[in-house]
Amino acid sequence: MDVQIIALDIDGTLTDDQKNISNLTLEALIEAEKKGIRLVLASTRPASGLFSIRDQLKMEQFGGILMSYNGGRITDCAGNTFYEISMGLTMTRRILRFLEELPVTVIVDDGKMFYVTDKNGYKVEYECRNNQMQCTEVGNLADWLTFSPIKILLAVDPMKIYEVQEQIRNFLPEDLTVVRTAAFYLEIFPRRINKGQGLCDICRILKIDVRNSIAFGDSENDIPMLKAAGIGIAMKNAEMDVKKASDMSTLSNNEDGIPYALRALNVI
């Protein structure tokens, strides 16, 4: 297999549980880049939440690609946008009003700033720190919002997340979907946005056969990417549905599962 792209989910895949990239994983991926393989960071985070990792992996030097918002925005490492898909403002406001009745903390962003109704809300500080972004507290989000976001992020008690997800799913129109991206996160996107479509679009833009790609992931929203890639690899810590959707599994995110798999496949 002529591997030309390695697509990487971030949290629970590329980073360990302390949100760090190990030296072994870092060295392995830079070695792959030096062999001409392009890296794709595939995350639900805003692009700015990927910049630190981009720099650690020297991706701008090697032509890497950033897939942010679960595939809703794709850019090169210099910030040039290939495409962006956002939610409509009217529908977003309607959803925000519906969410006021549910036990969730709502976070929206414009790529530069997070906006919430309560800075002390569940996981708000965590999300700001994780993405190295500031947070602005506004009144009522539905009344205040003046732009069309790419997604709506919801922090939810893990004990209630499946029930809340089902309530939201039943409310959303056909062209929107809600997915779990962590034990405590739900995210609402346009249905046509997913990491698998994003990977296919990147390969089309770069004129690379998607069969010459490898993807790593651990969560429900990684499944389309794992299925689209030539080889989809689930981390040991992945959810069972993710493992079933993948071609193979590797060690966990705390055990350098990425370099382990790349060496097993003779990529590096």
Where are each of the predicted segments found?
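Mg2+-dependent phosphoryl-transfer enzymes with acidic/Ser/Thr/Gly-rich catalytic loops
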Residues: M1-I5, S22, E187-I268
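Asp-based phosphoryl-transfer active-site loop
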Residues: D2-Q18
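Hydrophobic packing residues within well-ordered alpha-helices of enzyme cores
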Residues: T25, L50-R54, V164, I168, ...
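Active-site phosphate-binding/coordination module
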Residues: N23-K123
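Short active-site oxyanion
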Residues: G36-V40, F62-G64, K151, R211-N212, ...
